[in-house]
Amino acid sequence: MQYSELKQKSIKELEKMLAEYRAELFSLRFKNATRQLDQVHKIDLVKKDIARTLTAINEINRMTSQQQANPTKETKKAAKKTSKGEVK
């Protein structure tokens, strides 16, 4: 899945996908260890999907924490006006 598609999903959807990818990776590693896996490159593809998903989750978390930490200019102006006694 493309990274741009992942950024549009919610965190719950991403965490569900992450769990599925990790289960698939476990299965592929087990098959590889027992010499039942013919397409070994799939392990690398699933690892990359896991990395993309984790990156999308971390970016969403970072954006939400920044929005909570940094209020917008309008909010700052409103706070200054109310502290001076002026109200919109």
UniProtKB/Swiss-Prot annotation:
The keyword Ribonucleoprotein applies. CDD domains: Ribosomal_L29_HIP. Residues 73-88 have a biased composition (Basic and acidic residues). Residues 61-88 are annotated as: Disordered. One of its GO terms (biological process) is translation. NCBIfam families: L29 (TIGR00012). This is Large ribosomal subunit protein uL29. GO terms for molecular function: structural constituent of ribosome.
